[in-house]
């Protein structure tokens, strides 16, 4: 069910992904795409709109677009919503540690981040409240009232709160420095700063929705990868509660950017298959994958190889028992030609058809989709400001709580 795609830039990977997604749209199969460069989003929107026109129907309720670069409106995706079990919180903590390079600050910083995320999740809060939690004693005390996990409460009440101000500052500053760089950017602040997500990934999978995450890393920077990592982790956690097991595909270019080291990608792929979720992972070179991730990717059942570098061609030809002739072919494949190998079959060569972007104006489709899933950013910021003002005003004399 899973598919690994490998090939140099311009050799046909995008044509293959377009072809597969166009088939999914035509046959009502759901998918999520992490569009790291923003190159697939226009094709998807155009293809959905072309189908609407051909069939005289409306499909905006099937389409969900997460677009941090949209300056006017934004969906909400709170990764901490409902994440009040320790395993899920630990996964989010691991993602943030790696994305923000917090590992070298040591175990104390790691423990503080993990327990802080758990406390925020238990209170129905967001990453935006992390600074308040770690700097505002009264706010932290009020949060502890809703934390059922005794170890988390004891960590803050018996350990963190008993430290000197200087020691607490030393522990929290690396976390807050990295967090603020993410949450201060309006492109991402208005997505993760909403207490309630605009949609459920589990329901989107069950309904066969088309979820497009337009990350535009070249324009939005490294924060786009953090958002993509959080969304992929949210999807992983949503797998286990699926009511339906109909096929849902995750298209992910450069997947190594979105999974944490030691997160057990091979386990994720195995579990996803059980719940009807297929991954299509595309990349340019094998050495872009960390060793553990590379092993998991190479164990996927179906591989499609476009033109490869000399080193990768040698490695793959040896794995396929093709020897030097196959290695030479892999190095010299014409554009859109690929070698396909599934687990039980001998490798074969195919030609991927050219898939052109439909020449349609999908502005109305985007407007309808935004109306259903998104909120005006000015309104989101107003809600955030009001919420944080309310929390800041909490004092030790009058802790009114919030519900």
Predicted regions, residues:
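P-loop NTPase motor core of the ASCE superfamily
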Residues: 3, 104, 108, 266-269, ...
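A short acidic, often aromatic-flanked loop/helix-cap motif at beta-alpha or helix-coil junctions
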Residues: 1, 70-75, 311-313
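P-loop NTPase motor domains
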Residues: 6-11, 16-277, 281, 290-292, ...
């Amino acid at each position: 069910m899973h598919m690994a795609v490998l090939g140099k830039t311009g050799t046909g990977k995008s044509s293959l992904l377009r072809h597969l997604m166009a088939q999914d749209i035509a046959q009502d199969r759901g998918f999520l795409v992490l569009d790291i460069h923003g190159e697939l989003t226009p094709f998807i929107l155009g293809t959905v709109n072309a189908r609407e026109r051909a069939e005289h129907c409306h499909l905006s309720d099937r389409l969900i677009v997460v677009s941090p670069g949209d300056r006017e409106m934004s969906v909400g995706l709170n990764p901490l919503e409902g994440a009040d079990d320790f395993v899920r919180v630990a996964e989010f903590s691991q993602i943030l540690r790696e994305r923000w390079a917090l590992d070298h600050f040591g175990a104390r910083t790691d423990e503080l981040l993990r327990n802080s995320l758990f406390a925020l999740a238990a209170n129905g809060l967001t990453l935006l409240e992390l600074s308040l939690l770690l700097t505002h004693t009264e706010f932290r005390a009020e949060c502890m009232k809703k934390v059922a996990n005794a170890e988390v409460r004891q960590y803050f009440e018996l350990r963190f709160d008993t430290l000197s101000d200087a020691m607490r500052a030393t522990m929290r500053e690396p976390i807050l420095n990295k967090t603020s760089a993410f949450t201060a950017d309006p492109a991402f602040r208005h997505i993760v700063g909403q207490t309630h997500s605009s949609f459920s990934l589990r329901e989107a999978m069950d309904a066969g929705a088309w979820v497009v995450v337009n990350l535009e890393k070249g324009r939005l920077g490294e924060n786009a990868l953090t958002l993509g990592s959080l969304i992929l982790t949210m999807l992983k956690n949503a797998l286990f509660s699926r009511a339906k097991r109909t096929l849902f595909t995750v298209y992910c270019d450069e997947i190594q950017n979105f999974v944490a080291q030691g997160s057990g990608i091979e386990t994720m792929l195995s579990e996803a298959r059980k719940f009807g979720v297929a991954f299509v992972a595309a990349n340019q070179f094998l050495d872009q994958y960390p060793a553990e991730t590379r092993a998991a990717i190479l164990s996927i059942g179906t591989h499609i190889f476009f033109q490869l570098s000399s080193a990768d061609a040698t490695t793959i030809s040896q794995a396929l028992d093709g020897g030097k002739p196959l290695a030479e072919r892999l190095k010299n494949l014409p554009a859109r030609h690929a070698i396909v190998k599934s687990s039980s079959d001998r490798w074969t060569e195919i030609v991927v058809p050219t898939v052109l972007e439909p020449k349609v104006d999908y502005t109305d489709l985007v407007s309808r989709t935004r109306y259903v899933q998104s909120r005006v950013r000015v309104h989101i910021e107003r809600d955030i400001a009001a919420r944080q003002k309310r929390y800041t005003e909490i004092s030790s004399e009058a802790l009114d709580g919030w519900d």
